[in-house]
Amino acid sequence: AKGLHYDIPIVPQSQYEVGLVTKSFSDSTITITVLNEYEQLQWCVLWQDTRATKSVEYNPSDDQAIISIEPAWRESKGRSFIRVYAHANGKQLNDLLIPMQDGKVVNDVAELTRFDDHAQILYSLMIDRFHNGNKNNDWKMNSPEVLDIVDYQGGDIAGITKKIKEGFFDELGITTIWISPITQNPWDAWGMYPFPNGNKYDSTKTYTKFSGYHGYWPIFTTEVEKRFTTEQELHDMLATAHKHSMNVILDYVANHMHINSPTLQAHPDWHTDSILPDGRRNFELWDEARLTTWFDVHIPTLDLERPEVCSPMTDSALVWLDKFAFDGFRHDACKHIPLNYWRELGAKMKQRYPDRHIWMIGETYGDPALIGSYVKTGMLNAQFDF
């Protein structure tokens, strides 16, 4: 019934176990095979995030569990989902997600669409390294300070469009393409520790500066990277993907900006301190200084706990949804961004796009509790857990 409280335990990854497999279904029941024998197996069954009123029929000596399909489930219209959780003896078994359409269990993959979030097959690509579809935007640095492997290679949005049209993704069964960031990055090279020998370049060494081919050093948060695309090429790629029944999600960087960005030039106090109170350098302290640490000297972490910083940065993210038909975001470095940012972004999205299907997927490395703290109503829909 609505409003009932239930607890789903969070356990270390080592205590997860594959133990549940769907076996069969009828109009009134779903049968699950339990792969091992468990004593005191505890169940939680949800339909549309509301707990089932009937208990799971399970005998530890049997290898099957029976879930009753309740009247409200059978009478529902459109897509709905049953979720099954189980744990026993300190182990959490794999959860099951069972889609329903108009009250009937979906058992044909052809019935799934790009709007079924949990059934997506994602293809992650780095734009610069994928395919070159427009040689007119190829601008390598060709600098003796930059090894070719970390220079721009020519991949672009036009190349993605070409591969969609050729059926590359269709043949793989891809339903969602996750593209690397497309915000404008610096034109010069960065990210190298000082040269030895009086700061002079030595061709016998393998050290190098880096281009921004990866896209994670935004100079502007609302302008496309000219080496990758024009706005029209981006519109064309999104339209082509949707024609092929594919989503496109954008990797978006909110945690930091390049030190030479006009934003930080105008607001030099908008970043966190690079020196800790005890005098240590605040770099790469991923857990100790999770919300303030810098990734590198040239990409300061934004102080997003401050409203005057958080508000315009959430607005910048929304520009990509206002101007382009993206299906969502893969958010970079989520655990280094405070919760107030996600709450504000989620609230603005709900107000601005009440009827639009938008993914919010995050990247967080850490324990299940930290990962799960961002997956809440009005924040992220899901996080990667690897």
Feature annotation, model-predicted:
Residues 2-12, 92-100:
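Edge beta-strands of extracellular beta-sandwich domains
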Residues 6-37:
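Extracellular ectodomain segments of secreted/surface proteins
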Residues 59-68:
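Aromatic sugar-binding surface patches on proteins
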Residues 69-227, 231-244:
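N-terminal structural segment of carbohydrate-active enzymes
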Residues 118-122, 170-177, 242-249, 324-329, ...:
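Loop/turn elements at helix/coil->beta-strand transitions in domains of secreted/extracellular proteins
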Residues 139, 185-214, 254-289, 375-383:
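Aromatic- and acidic-residue-enriched segments that line the glycan-binding/catalytic groove
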Residues 268-324, 334:
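Active-site-adjacent "subsite" loops/lids of carbohydrate-active enzymes
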Residues 315-318, 322-386:
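Active-site-proximal helices and loops of the catalytic beta/alpha 8
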